[in-house]
Amino acid sequence: MKQTRRILAALLTLICLAYCFAAAESAVFTETPLPDPSAIHSFEELPWYLTLVNAQHGVPENWVIPAFTELKHSQRVDSRIYPQLQKMFDDARAEGILPVVLTSYRTYEDQKNMLVKKYRKYKDKGMSTEEAQAEALKVAAYPGYSEHQLGLAVDIDSADTEKCGNDTVWDWMKRHCQNYGFIWRYPGQKSEITGISNESWHFRYVGVEAATYIMSNQLCLEEYLEQVYGLK
């Protein structure tokens, strides 16, 4: 009986340590005070499809998307953008282009777990807490500050790279996306404004009117919102 109690006590200790370790890793990303997403996202005058999410503008954990449409590979998007996304893909395929959505909507919890996973990866390489945090944030945003939490953004690759390479897919998307209300969200030349380095695969729905203006004038979303709505 005593041995059983000792085993149970040891197991409880291990569980508590594991929980505390995980909580500490998650908490490391909140040690530096961040803007409250619910406070900074006060753009009621903006249409839903122009919601801005970047390092300065976030959405709260309880951000509501009215309805989702399921895609292949366990992906899903805001149902309001699905018809245009599907039409864009259908038209691309008619021209021999083979796009597929690799990443779309992420929950707040998904984003948090992704960030912690990246942090652990760098810690395991021997980096300090500060170094690991800095490296993790280069490839994963704080929860609430990723466009993927809007359900309006998709990462697109080729469904068959032997028949149609990724670059071919991305080039087609960049030339035609505005016709369907999408923009190439993170061009390399706009990285100082967006805070994101070149991502040829990341496309974001903003509506046909805004997309046409943005792509025709080689703007990023931040520049468009400043010009049209005075948002900084």
Residue ranges and their predicted role:
Residues 19-232:
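Extracytoplasmic cell-surface/polysaccharide-interacting catalytic and binding patches
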Residues 4-25:
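Sec-dependent N-terminal signal peptides of Gram-positive bacterial secreted proteins and lipoproteins
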